[in-house]
Amino acid sequence: MKGRGERIVMVSTYDHLTAKMVDEAGVDIILVGDSLANVILGYQDTLSVTMDEMIHHTKAVSRAAKRALVVGDMPFMSYQASAEDAIKNAGRFLKEGRAQAVKVEGGRGVMKKVEAIVQSGIPVMGHLGLTPQWVHQFGGFKVRGKTAAAARAILEDAKMLERAGVFSLVLECVPWQLAKLVTKKLEIPTIGCGAGPYCDGQVLVFHDLVGLTASTPKFVKRYADLGGPMKKAVEDFRNEVKTGKFPTLEHSYEMPAGEVKELAGARKRKRRG
């Protein structure tokens, strides 16, 4: 798509219902992100989500996706320990989760694992910049690559990942000037997440872009505000149940009059007996 100048659209989502919507909307890639941890499962950060949880949700998304590429996000410690772990767990995403590719966070520190996964025949999407799995190492959720030295390091990591065989690269929370430079220097497409307008594609979390989350980062644009109306719908349901307004006969099933009469007669006969 990069060669044709066509922008890539990627959305992160985690269940069959929303994945079906996203797929039908014409999105190119569905990422089952490790943000499943805090968006859906209620964890404080992405470090807590397990392989089994990721596979479970990837299965649901894959069953919904008819046209979009499904990418499974390798969770924390599913690939860092060894190349063998990396290959095994990446393989689970394809074999069990029915994804077509995996995403791996990190640069030179995970290069051998990325190479091993690629050489095993599994497509890999890279991820540089703000990498949440490395948040403690980098001192928190901050924009990366703001100095010339830090930017050069990210650019070099990007080139190394391309040589290692990744088919695309997510750039998260980096200055737009750096993202533009990386995009220009690489032959593979870049997908921005808070990386400005010059990447080859963009990604947002479904729940952020439709307004289901309470707060969002600066780089998120809300295309709807569904959280409020959804909450109100539940409140209206609660109120109508409490006051007896729901359900009405309109929402009820009916027995034919003859059967009602027969039932009443049977009950009378039973009482006499």
Which sequence ranges carry the predicted segments?
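Alpha/beta enzyme core
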Residues: 1-224, 228-257, 261-273
